[in-house]
Swiss-Prot record:
The keyword Ubl conjugation does not apply. The gene is SOK2. This is Protein SOK2. Residues 1-12, 20-37, 95-121, 266-282, 304-318 have a biased composition (Polar residues). The keyword Phosphoprotein applies. Residues 78-94, 206-219, 232-265, 322-339, 523-538, 655-674 have a biased composition (Low complexity). Residues 1-45, 78-121, 202-355, 519-538, 642-785 are annotated as: Disordered. Residues 687-702 have a biased composition (Basic and acidic residues). GO terms for biological process: positive regulation of transcription by RNA polymerase II; pseudohyphal growth.
């Protein structure tokens, strides 16, 4: 049967009645939260007592002060959308209506599309009240249809008053006899008479009543009779009195009834899943934040599950009222969402995860989602625009964090230290509410403009506050976070405390902010600015220290000799980082360690050695040629095995390792005689072959690659050049000599380090005879071959 038609018996418009019938169909399945017959009887009694006097008045316009509830917001949705959506629900949920025309028929087992038998009087549901989907008795149907109606008496008593206040959006159906929805006894008689007609819209009425009652409970009108208050406590404790006239349309009742009627709610959900779109009702004050139907407003789910909470349980509906905030009593505004205390500025649109889980698990009904979305909009509207002048400060990023608004949950902001080049000072900047507030490190002044921008105050008020400051420094040039009016630290702190943003800017207003930074980064004592500029472990003051003063123990240990002795020198246009390392202990791969010898610092070098170094950098290619095929050891660590070939990037098979000897004490002598040598423990091989200061590798080099001076004329000059010496085939001596020593692996045997160390000792002792003898032996070998 067309569900809406029988409702025409009422003076209400057919459209309204149709909607209401749809609502009632929905609410019947929902209200099937059956309670013990005693409770039902009690409910009926309460309803009869409190509501009957009001019954004849089906539409009373409630004074907005008394009825600030946003039911009309909610129910306009329910009507406009419920007309579309609740009708399919009607067919799904209340097949019994269609078949029998009345809920009262127990004969229709599939009362809900879910397939809950209509007779199933007691189906245990989480709320603890059995779902009495439809009882065979019409009289019982009344009570059964009532969803969690803890509040009927209240709602019904004032329903007549409240009904038409939202009338612009929806109309509250009167029972067939013209009595208000809240009058259960009359409803029962009407239903007995017209079970088909009145039952349908009675459920809708029940829904409306349910909403109104819940809202009434939430606000607990002074107008309500004390009896109503008692009914609250009783019914909330014992379980919602099931009132046939009360439809489960009120957001709380929907939630509760749907918790209990999870089955019926399942049937309802598919059509109504689109239902909760609050954006359809964008009232002037609403933010469109709740356009997402699933992001339920943080209406405290607990209040829904435990209706005993009375006003707090109503907070869900109250949140809908938010647009009318002017009408709400102050206590109600506080109650509106117990999750957010008065200080909470966070947009309530972001519910805690447990709320979401609650909503999804317990509230399957779509109308709940509808209310949730509405509540969401309302809540967001209230908390952001009404509650606090600074809507989003509670979260470090208004968009990001899911904090509940308490300062304890605020994530500590990150402090960034940057260098203000123009002012030659460091700056600490903390971002709050999307704005970076900067404090100078030298004089602790704070950018007052950005500080006040965090509060989201108007520009005029901000400028007025800043103009009142006696000490201020205006910066008009630079990056955005540096522009503005800079005020002293104390004044900035006072303003921040007055505007209640000091906590959000932690630790900007801690006097000794360096200590906080060091605590947060114990491993890195340097400020983050140094790391941001690429300089590690250097305190900010080192910006202004000469390079030579740097002491970087963490520098690379395999630094070339020239870098070590003359660290700030620019070798071949390549800037060498300044690292003065007293002792280099790196050992080339595959080489056994020699004795560690301390590097002479630059102050130990004589002036002429530095000049040698300088000339070395300019004339390096020539020096390499002049020195035979041994390139200067600039690019090698002290203990690295120096291959004449490897210096040039060529690796002939017959190259022999050249192991540097530790530094000798006669640095002056070697530096004078060795033009290209750098006193880093590596004495460059000299062209003269007879020197007693030759180290062992220089001797081997001379024997293998360079010819003593007395033989240079006999050798082709190319043999002394690095590349030709390595590649030329015309000098048999060189090839054979290197082939002899090619048998020595790159990793010298253990005997070799001893030999080399002994040779270095012989150097130090001035035992030149040994070296001369070895050279002579080598020469004889060459000549023989």
């Amino acid at each position: 049967m067309p569900i809406g038609n029988p409702i025409n018996t009422n003076d209400i418009k057919s459209n309204r009645m149709r909607q209401e019938s749809n609502m009632s169909a929905v609410s019947n399945s929902e209200s099937t939260i059956g309670q013990s017959t005693q409770q039902q009887q009690q409910q009926q009694q309460y309803l009869g007592q409190s509501v009957q006097p009001l019954m004849p008045v089906s539409y009373q316009y409630v004074v907005p002060e008394q009825w600030p509830y946003p039911q009309y917001y909610q129910q306009p949705q329910s009507q406009s959308q419920q007309q579309l959506q609740s009708q399919p629900q009607m067919y799904q949920v209340q097949e019994s209506f269609q078949s029998s025309g009345s809920d009262s028929n127990a004969s229709n087992p599939p009362s809900t599309s879910v397939g809950v038998p209509s007779n199933a009087t007691a189906t245990a549901l989480p709320n603890g009240s059995a779902i009495t989907t439809k009882k065979s008795n019409n009289s019982t149907n009344i009570s059964n249809n009532v969803p969690y109606y803890y509040y009927f008496p209240q709602m019904q008593a004032q329903q007549s008053m409240a009904y038409s206040y939202p009338q612009a959006y929806y109309y509250y159906p009167a029972n067939g006899d013209g009595t208000t929805n809240g009058a259960t006894p009359s409803v029962t008689s009407n239903q007995v008479q017209n079970p088909n007609l009145e039952k349908t819209y009675s459920t809708f009425e029940q829904q409306q009543q349910h909403q109104q009652q819940q809202q009434l409970q939430a606000q607990t009108y002074p107008a309500q009779p004390p009896k109503i208050g008692n009914a609250f406590s009783k019914f909330s404790k014992s379980g919602p009195p099931s009132d046939s006239s009360s439809g489960s349309m009120s957001p709380n009742s929907n939630r509760t009834s749907r918790n209990s009627n999870s089955i019926s709610s399942l049937a309802q959900q598919p059509p109504m899943s689109n239902y909760p779109q609050p954006s359809t009702y964008q009232y002037p004050g609403f933010h469109k934040t709740s356009s997402i139907p699933n992001s339920h407003s943080p209406i405290p789910p607990r209040s829904l599950t435990t209706p005993t909470q009375g006003p707090t349980s109503q907070n869900g509906p109250l949140s809908y009222n938010l647009p009318q905030v002017g009408l709400l009593p102050p206590q109600q505004q506080q109650q509106v969402s117990p999750l957010y205390d008065g200080n909470s500025i966070t947009p309530p649109v972001k519910p805690s995860t447990d709320q979401e889980t609650y909503l999804t698990a317990n509230r399957h009904g779509v109308s709940d989602q509808q209310y949730d979305s509405m509540a969401k909009t309302m809540n967001s509207f209230q908390t952001t625009t009404i509650r606090h002048p600074m809507p989003l400060i509670a979260t470090t990023n208004a968009t990001g964090s899911n904090t509940s608004g308490t300062s304890a949950s605020i994530i500590r902001p990150r402090v960034t230290t940057t260098m203000w080049e123009d002012e030659k000072t460091l700056c600490y900047q903390v971002e709050a509410n999307g704005i970076s507030v900067v404090r100078r490190a030298d004089n602790d002044m704070v950018n007052g403009t950005k500080l006040l921008n965090v509060t989201k105050m108007t520009r005029g008020r901000r400028d007025g506050i800043l103009k009142a400051e006696k000490i201020r420094h205006v910066v008009k040039i630079g990056s955005m976070h540096l522009k503005g009016v800079w005020i002293p630290f104390e004044r900035a702190l006072a303003i921040a405390q007055r505007e209640k943003i000091a906590d959000y800017l932690y630790p900007l207003f801690i006097r000794d902010i360096q200590s906080v930074l060091k605590q947060n980064n114990p491993s890195n004592d340097s400020s983050s600015s140094s790391s941001s500029t690429g300089i590690k472990s250097i305190s900010p003051r080192t910006y202004y220290q000469p390079i030579n003063n740097y002491q970087n123990p963490n520098g690379p240990s395999n630094i070339s000799a020239a870098q070590l002795t003359y660290s700030s020198m620019n070798l071949n246009n390549k800037i060498i980082p300044n690292n003065s390392i007293p002792a280099v202990s790196t050992i080339a791969a595959g080489e056994k360690p020699l004795k560690k010898c301390t590097m002479p610092n630059s102050n130990q070098l004589e002036g002429h050695t530095i000049t040698n170094l300088q000339t070395l950098s300019a004339t390096m290619p020539m020096k390499q040629q002049l020195m035979g095929n041994i390139a200067s050891p600039l690019s090698y660590p002290r203990n690295a095995t120096m291959n004449s070939a490897s210096t040039l990037g060529i690796t002939p098979a017959d190259s022999k390792p050249l192991t540097p000897s530790p530094t000798t004490t006669n640095t002056n002598q070697s530096s004078e005689s060795n033009v290209g040598s750098i006193h880093t423990g590596i004495t460059l091989p000299r062209v003269e072959s007879e020197s007693a200061s030759h180290s062992k590798w220089s001797k081997e080099a001379d024997s293998g690659n360079t010819v003593p001076d007395n033989q240079t004329l006999k050798e082709p000059r190319s043999s002394q050049l690095p590349i030709s010496a390595l590649t030329s085939t015309d000098t048999d001596k060189i090839k054979t000599s290197t082939s002899d020593e090619a048998t020595q692996p790159n990793e010298p045997s253990e005997a070799e380090p001893v030999k080399e160390s002994e040779s270095s000792k012989s150097q130090v002792d001035g035992a030149g005879d040994v070296s001369n003898e070895e050279i002579a032996a080598d020469d004889t070998k060459k000549q023989e071959k």
